[in-house]
Amino acid sequence: MPLLRRLLAATVESRAGRVLVSRSPAPRAAPGAPPLATPAVARLSAKGKFLFVGDEKLYVRGVTYGAFEPDGQGHEYHDVGKIERDFADMAAHGINTVRIPHTMPPRTLLDIAQRHGLHVMVGLSAEQYVGYLIDRRNAPDIEALIRGKVRSCAGHPALLCYALGNEIPASVARWLGTRRVERYLRRLFQVVKEEDPEGLVTYVNYPTTEYLRLPFLDLVCFNVYLESQDRFEAYLARLQNIAADRPLVMSELGLDSLRHGESAQARSLDWQVRTAFAAGCAGVFVFSWTDEWYRHGQEVGEWAFGLTRADRSPKAALEAVREAFAQVPFWPELPWPRVSVVVCTHNGSRTIRDCLAGLQRLAYPDYEVIVVDDGSTDDTAAIVRQHPVRLIQTVNRGLAKARNTGLEAATGEIIAYLDDDAYPDPHWLTYLAATFLSTAHAAVGGPNVAPAGDGAVADCVARAPGGPVHVLLTDREAEHIPGCNMAFRKARLEAIGGFDGQFRVAGDDVDVCWRLRERGWTLGFHPAGMVWHHRRNSIRAYWKQQIGYGRAEAMLERKWPEKYNGPGHVRWAGRIYGSGLPAVFSWGRSRVYHGIWGLAPYQSLYEPAPSLLSSLPRMPEWYLIVASLAGLSLLSIAWSPLRLALPLLLLATVPPVALACLGAARARFSDEPRRWAARVGRRLLTAALHLAQPLARLRGRLKEGLTPWRQHGTPAPAPLWSVTTSTWSERWQAHERRLAWLEATMRAEGVCVLRGSGSDCWDLEVRGGFFGAARLLLAVEDHPGGQLVRLRSWPDVPARGPLFMLGCAALAWGAARDQATLAAVALGVCALFVALRGVEQCTAAMATIRRAFRRLSKGDC
């Protein structure tokens, strides 16, 4: 059931007299009345998922305008009187933006738009010149043409943005290749920025070339025509993930009234516009203002997409769109649930003022703010008392317990948690609450974006790894939502006992998401439910934060060992999204599905998930490999053959440095310095943070015991060979139920228990550690009066342990033969350590299986 229908159902059921949600202002005059809009004077900016005029959010409520038949001089927009009348009528119907899709309009048109309070999106027609990349004969100076067009309207206050082009034909893009088209558009983007640095730049894409990666654009625009509301809603969610932290604008949507009828057009445009804004779009352009349309040297009469007829008489769709535009982003009356916003703080005086000021600007009808001061020693409490919020002061007990204190005090159906160094978008709660109204999710999160103006270090930290990210299973369902921006149904959060108090600094959000999903509940994600999140503004603070995250990882691994792999990293089922993600070496080539003859209507880019091998250089444990090679290089003083480790050491340092440089080169800064030296310095600092982050995490992980040689389970005497045993049970139970009981029993001991895949010949694996494990296979025979339960268990030794041990032993033997005692002893100790650790981990795993089966034999199952 589409989101729009679910929200409509909620509207019908809402109580009369509910307080309305405040919306971004929209002209709402009746048709024929003078325009109510204020003439545009300020330049626009893109901030996070939305567009702003100064500090005021602008929802683009637009229509396309043209193309029209040119006059004898080739001027398409020559009838000034008609333009004046059209723009006045647009403003009277709640339209605030006009898109000129194919030709650069004269400056006169922008002046008229400004008089009527309209913004204009102008097209630079890059698609008309792309063919010259194939055949350069008689090619014009494309850059000069673009510069001339930009100069004709640069700096105009009515300018919304420049569109580099509109729908480069899929066959041409396929001929040229993806990278060549991307480079072409990037270069034109740079040309526009050179002429108008403050102007916003986009490219109007469409589903057939969705695969183009254009991260440099200021906003993302797509033309999408779908007659199915379900498919439209699903595709919008996909486009939001492509847009990432940038605004998404529907640059064209519509329906042909000739084929479907004017009533069907009105109904379709109503749900298209409402669905787009409910999905978090920053704006919508309806195609088109009028049925008058001229293309390729002739009037187009086979289609009628206009809101008005060619003579400008209105269709039913015009009133439908006017009403939909007046009610963005949501219907004005919904049964909005009461929300309790909980802010937990400890010595947060530097940022909590911004946080509370942002909460006061929320456009939501029914919410309370609870601030839990977790033992602050600065003037945090004094700042909080200056705001109309509820303050609860406690001794310092840690973040998770502070969150639980807020939960106990909350009166809302929904509990929304916000960090004290973050502040929300005015419609933050609106988008999150709408998701709760339309789904059964237990929790909903949204993106967190670093604001501009926090300084060079904070800007670099925002582009470095280690920030709060979200993990998505699908375009709308999450596996993890970060703690700085997460909301819960209070009943669901109370049902799992709230947050685990052992997590004092970090990790509580990961734990609570896993516990909710363990209960069979789902997590949602809304791309427009965003908050602005200040990053650390000093290298020391960033280092300390990452150490804390490393310790939290170790604590989570102890509680959820089955969620981690052998080296100690989370095995996410979904994809990680967010800024500052470290680059990886991609061994698997990305593919584009073009369809037969390149005719697939939706052509997506498919990228394989990074493999363990390609991800190794960015892992904290890579530094242990580097340290081991450095140790061998030092031992070469005692035994010269170990000098071979020196080139390996140099080789091992190349991947992390290369990936750090690549990540810094790809970073886009919110306020890029103009001086060359400052730009280089900022990227060098970003690269240094990419290198430092895994090291800080490694330190935190090691301090908390998360080491590659860690052990799960209690050591106990157990055989190191295959063991078969059986027991008789007079109580019949299904085979899978006995396995589930064994799994739960062993996990209760705090060990890591994994299930075999569909192609494995074993049922469960008990991981003793990185060097040893044990596996079991269960069989159940049915007999009169009971069941015979058979179990076979055997140790499993990964190849890495014996290989490392044999390598060290061989080197130790060589050093001993050359009478290099120091090197021989050091290498021998390493070999012995791995051997003993493997034995210990295998016996611990076998002992765990034996204890669980003994309990099963006693009838505990």
Regions found by a protein language model. Name each.
Residues 174, 179-278, 306-308:
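Extracellular glycoside hydrolase catalytic/binding regions
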Residues 415:
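Short aromatic/hydrophobic "clamp" motif used to bind/position activated sugar donors
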Residues 287-335:
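Aromatic-rich peripheral "rim/lid" segments of glycoside hydrolase catalytic domains that contact
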Residues 358, 373-382, 419-422:
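A conserved acidic beta->alpha catalytic loop
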Residues 357-366:
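Short, acidic, metal-binding catalytic loop of nucleotide-sugar glycosyltransferases
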Residues 50-60, 64-220:
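Active-site mouth of glycoside hydrolases
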Residues 427-458, 522, 528, 534:
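Conserved donor NDP-sugar-binding/catalytic core segment of glycosyltransferases
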Residues 446-447, 461-479, 494:
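Short, flexible, basic/aromatic active-site loop/helix in glycosyltransferases
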